[in-house]
């Protein structure tokens, strides 16, 4: 079940909208990102969300729960594949910690902090979280966790955008490209998470090129 839940995000046709990612990138980096870069950032963020939701759904099912609860997210984040990635070292201290708390108040606080940090007044990713839970976890989410996981997606977009912007700056590029995003993913993720995100990016860009 876990393998099917972790199917390609491109095949599932679920990912952050390119326009939403573009807005975040411009506000975070003050650099222009081409369409391929925005698609790549969206796919990387979605790959992380799918993995987190799928692992949390597995935890919920093992406990016989009908919904994903905060401690299911906490256990998922504490798994080895997450803890080995630099992205999760940062996120645990910022967005993900709120989802591993025991109260809805903590989850909302994490979501609010991530929104403010990203300079985005309204988190645009709530509907994405709900669709992802249906498509990959098939387990209901509590309302506070929808908020917190939306903050998680925003944090993923923020970190990938920031790191891709740094890669662009090092090469004196004025535009963030998909290659800069791949560099960011390589820096932020490790092991299967990295491989999954890079594969999703590659598949999405091939599909985009075929549609043009």
What are these regions (language model features)?
Residues 1-212:
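Histone-fold and other basic nucleic-acid-binding segments
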């Amino acid at each position: 079940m876990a393998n099917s839940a972790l199917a390609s995000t491109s095949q599932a046709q679920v990912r952050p909208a390119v326009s939403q990612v573009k807005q975040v990138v411009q506000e975070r980096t003050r650099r222009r990102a081409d369409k391929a870069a925005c698609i790549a950032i969206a796919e990387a963020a979605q790959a992380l969300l799918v993995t987190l939701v799928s692992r949390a759904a597995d935890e919920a099912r093992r406990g016989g729960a009908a919904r994903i609860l905060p401690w299911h997210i906490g256990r998922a984040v504490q798994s080895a594949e997450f803890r080995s990635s630099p992205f999760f070292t940062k996120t645990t201290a910022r967005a993900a910690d709120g989802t591993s708390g025991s109260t809805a108040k903590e989850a909302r606080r994490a979501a609010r902090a991530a929104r403010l940090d990203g300079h985005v007044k309204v988190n645009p990713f709530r509907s994405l979280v709900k669709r992802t839970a249906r498509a990959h976890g098939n387990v209901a989410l509590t309302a506070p966790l929808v908020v917190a996981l939306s903050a998680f997606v925003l944090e993923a977009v923020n970190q990938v955008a920031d790191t891709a912007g740094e890669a662009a700056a090092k090469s004196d590029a004025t535009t963030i490209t998909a290659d800069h995003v791949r560099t960011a993913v390589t820096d932020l993720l490790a092991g299967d998470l990295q491989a999954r995100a890079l594969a999703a990016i590659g598949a999405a860009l091939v599909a985009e090129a075929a549609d043009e």
